[in-house]
Amino acid sequence: MNIISEHGFRIDGRRPAQIRNINTRLGLNRNAEGSCYLEHGNTKVLCAVYGPYEGKSSKRIEDKCAIVCQYSATKFSGLERKNRTRGDRKSTEISRLLEKAFESVILTEAFPRSQLDIFCEVIQGDGSNLAACVNATSLALADAGIPMKGIASAATCGVVDGKPIVDLTSREETDLLPRVTLATICGRDEVILVELQNRLHIDHLSTVMDAAKATCADVYECLAVVAQQHLKACAPILGN
């Protein structure tokens, strides 16, 4: 199957450097301090943030807040038809990646000896799932009013015939394309997460990294608008 047609289009009609539509809804989970439902193309993610609250003794850190992430995916979320419950190897790996990323984003020193829980569930996976979780988590944290260095944005990019393609779908990922998931703060050069899937030739590394950084900047612009609009909508309520 050709990833890019002779006319320069991908299977879903996008150009190689074109991202999918991003739609979000914040504050849906009233039991959480912050929440976000995010659709990135056909990838759908729900994220909820709880805390900060007094941390468990096993998790407690004297001078900062402990970040605990749990990732899961529903049974019919993707092509695998496999339920990724909290605790399987891949889910644990993604959970740790999210923890490390957001430890670099959240101002954890503002909440010593406390704990912040982040739950991410992929309801429907159509590629770039980890990137979508990062983006949903950023908005859920913003909804919760958690102080951060800035909004984190992420993107998954691959290489076809030495040329980058951005925001991969599930069908593109199943072709075992060399790909990188990258996350940055405020769409700038401060990288907080890098995940490499499949072998990538060293000659293509800088190309795909540059494409991923540029895509993170594009995604950040979308997320920043959502966060600003949500803040404006909440301002009258907070004022009362």
Curated annotation (Swiss-Prot):
GO terms for molecular function: RNA binding. CDD domains: RNase_PH_RRP41. InterPro entries: ExoRNase_PH_dom1 (IPR001247), ExoRNase_PH_dom2 (IPR015847), ExoRNase_PH_dom2_sf (IPR036345), PNPase/RNase_PH_dom_sf (IPR027408), Ribosomal_Su5_D2-typ_SF (IPR020568), RNase_PH (IPR050080), RNase_PH_CS (IPR018336). Keywords: Cytoplasm, Exosome, Nucleus, RNA-binding, rRNA processing. It is found in: Cytoplasm; Nucleus, Nucleolus; Nucleus; Nucleus, Nucleoplasm. Gene3D superfamilies: GHMP Kinase, N-terminal domain. One of its GO terms (cellular component) is nucleoplasm. The keyword Protease does not apply. GO terms for biological process: nuclear mRNA surveillance; poly(A)-dependent snoRNA 3'-end processing; rRNA catabolic process; rRNA processing; U4 snRNA 3'-end processing. It comes from the Eukaryota. Exos-4.1 and tin-9.2 are transcribed on a dicistronic transcript where exos-4.1 is the upstream transcript and tin-9.2 the downstream. Component of the RNA exosome complex. Belongs to the RNase PH family. Non-catalytic component of the RNA exosome complex which has 3'->5' exoribonuclease activity and participates in a multitude of cellular RNA processing and degradation events. This is Putative exosome complex component RRP41. The gene is exos-4.1.
